Each structure stands twice: as structure tokens, then as C-alpha cells.
């Protein structure tokens, strides 16, 4: 029986140092409406999300449409790059992708973040066999999850993601069978 997980990278957010509470921008809310419109066509059964506000706000229209509460899952929160803002994000993110076991002080290595994301993903798969499930999340953790099932999804793929973006991962049991990009702004 096929299970479909729709991973939704959050829409554009207004920068604040508060990672958990950072809201969507005006443009982000517009794109979140497009996310809802696209996913209305997919017969969604449940909606899960990272607890970060921007991820929740991106998928809350889908939850309202299907009249279900969003279930918050810590495992889908963004990977922690470092305990403090890094001087050069590009250098910092490149290093963790080149060495899966490297982590900056107070941050998560790719391997640790991936393990967290996969644990959450497998729990969702096990409790939603044969269903269509939306997961509001973040770019880095989303690609780490995809990479676990197919290593073609790596750093270069992450760099090409849009904000927001939607990927439908189809599973038979715990085996990923297909990946389709759903996001289309037009």
C-alpha cells in the first residue's frame, strides 16, 4: 500500500533572531496560499510540522482545508548549524555537507540531524500507511531525510531548492519508490 509524504519547505520568513518564533513575510503568506491550493488536489489526510512558526504557517491552510489539527514534531525542526550565528553561512554549511560527522560548536552534524529527521519520518510512515501526509519543515533537514533514502539528494540539490518548495515522496512500506516535485508558483 502506497504512502505519500509531502515535504513542504517553509515559505519566506521575516528574519528575527528567534528561530522558533520567526514568522512568514508578506510574500511568504502569499506563497503559503499557493502551497494550500496545490495540496488541495492531493487528498491530504494529515498534517505534521516542525514546531517553528514559519513551517506551521506555511502548512496551516492545508490543515484548515481538511479540518484537522497540525501535529507538531520536533524531529522535523531545522538542523542546528551552530550555537551562535556563524560569520560565513556558506562556508559553515559547505563544511557540514562535506563531512557528515563534522559539527560546529553547539550544532548538529549531518549524521545527527539526519538521524533525528529519519526517526520522525519513520514514525509518520508507520502510523499513516496508505495515507497522504503533509510535513511542514525546513530545507536542510528535508534534504537530509531525502538523502537517507536516495543519496542523489545532497548539497547541490539543497542549493537549488526554492522557498517554499514541495516534494512528494512515495513509499511502499519504508522503501521510497518515487519523488515528484509538486511546487509550481505559476
Describe the function of each predicted region.
Residues 5, 131-140:
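Generic beta-sheet signal
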Residues 23, 64-118, 159:
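Phosphate-handling substructures
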Residues 2, 38-42, 68-72, 78-90, ...:
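Acidic, low-complexity terminal tails and accessory targeting/binding regions
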Residues 61, 144-148:
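Active-site signature of alpha/beta-hydrolase-fold catalytic machinery across serine-
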Residues 33-40, 118-126:
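Generic structural signal for well-ordered alpha-helical scaffold segments
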Residues 2-72, 111:
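Active-site-proximal alpha-helix that buttresses catalytic centers in soluble enzyme cores
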Residues 49-50, 115, 136-137:
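Short beta-strand scaffold positions
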Residues 13, 141-142:
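Short active-site segment of divalent metal-dependent hydrolases/proteases
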Amino acid at each position: 500500500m502506497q504512502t505519500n509524504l509531502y515535504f513542504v519547505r517553509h515559505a519566506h520568513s521575516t528574519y528575527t533572531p528567534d528561530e522558533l518564533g520567526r514568522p512568514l513575510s508578506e510574500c511568504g503568506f502569499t506563497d503559503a496560499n499557493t502551497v494550500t491550493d496545490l495540496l488541495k488536489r492531493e487528498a491530504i489526510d494529515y498534517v505534521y510540522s516542525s514546531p517553528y512558526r514559519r513551517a506551521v504557517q506555511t502548512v496551516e491552510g492545508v490543515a484548515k482545508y481538511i479540518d484537522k489539527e497540525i501535529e507538531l514534531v520536533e524531529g522535523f525542526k531545522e538542523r542546528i548549524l551552530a550555537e551562535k550565528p556563524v560569520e560565513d553561512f556558506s562556508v559553515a554549511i559547505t563544511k557540514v555537507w562535506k563531512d557528515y560527522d563534522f559539527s560546529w560548536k553547539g550544532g548538529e552534524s549531518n549524521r545527527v540531524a539526519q538521524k533525528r529527521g529519519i526517526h520522525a519520518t519513520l514514525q509518520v510512515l508507520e502510523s499513516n500507511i496508505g495515507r497522504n501526509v503533509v510535513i511542514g519543515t525546513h530545507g536542510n533537514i528535508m534534504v537530509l531525510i531525502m538523502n537517507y533514502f536516495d543519496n542523489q539528494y545532497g548539497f547541490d540539490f539543497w542549493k537549488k531548492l526554492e522557498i517554499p518548495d514541495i516534494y512528494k515522496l512515495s513509499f511502499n512500506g519504508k522503501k521510497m519508490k518515487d519523488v515528484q516535485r509538486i511546487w509550481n508558483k505559476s
